[in-house]
Regions:
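Alpha-helical transmembrane segments of multi-pass integral membrane proteins
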Residues: 2-15, 32-50
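Alpha-helical transmembrane segments and their membrane-interface exit regions
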Residues: 4-15, 102-105, 127-133
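Membrane-interface capping segments at transmembrane-helix boundaries
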Residues: 15-20, 135-151
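Membrane-interface helix termini and inter-helical loops of multi-pass transporters
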Residues: 21-25, 53-65, 110-114
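A loop-to-helix transmembrane entry motif
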Residues: 32-40, 60-74
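Membrane-interface transmembrane-helix boundary segments in multi-pass integral membrane proteins
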Residues: 64-80, 107-133
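Membrane-helix interface "capping/anchor" motifs
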Residues: 83-96
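Central hydrophobic cores of alpha-helical transmembrane segments
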Residues: 93-105
Length: 152
């Protein structure tokens, strides 16, 4: 419950700061916007992880769908969120957090002594590629809230 309150609070702050919108001063962007983007990204990922852990803890059967399919479905939500933040808010920093989380999933699933679930490993790799390409394209097209054409 605390994570959900934090998530909602950060979403409200993010919107009030107008992250990704024009008119922000460079120092405000560097010192405030980027930090809130990263923080919101981590709280988003942590909320998803905590909900997943809770469902596992209560032995939720996932409506009979395999855990690997559920994992990939949840990872897909992460990909969609990252892409939405890139394209709606020009926010690559939120997306970088999701990319980093996918790297963590990949590293954990490929570590010695860990059950390697090929579907989850593949989803992590594909997710990192999709998000990374979207980030690079946003940078190339100068669709990043840190880069303003007037400052180039």
């Amino acid at each position: 419950m605390v994570m959900l309150i934090m998530l909602v609070s950060l979403i409200i702050i993010y919107r009030k700061l107008k992250i990704g919108e024009r008119g922000s001063r460079k120092m405000e962007v560097l010192l405030v916007h980027i930090n809130f983007s990263v923080y919101l990204g981590w709280i988003s990922i942590a909320t998803i992880a905590n909900i997943t852990a809770f469902l596992v803890d209560i032995d939720w059967n996932g409506f009979g769908i395999s855990p690997a399919i559920w994992t990939v479905s949840v990872m897909s939500v992460g990909i969609v969120l990252a892409l939405l933040f890139i394209y709606l808010h020009k926010d690559i920093f939120y997306a970088l957090v999701v990319d980093w989380a996918f790297l963590g999933i990949y590293l954990k699933r490929t570590a010695p002594g860990t059950e390697a679930v090929l579907l989850v490993i593949s989803a992590a790799i594909i997710g990192m590629i999709i998000i990374s390409v979207a980030i690079v394209l946003a940078i190339i097209k100068k669709r990043v809230y840190v880069i303003r054409k007037s400052e180039l």
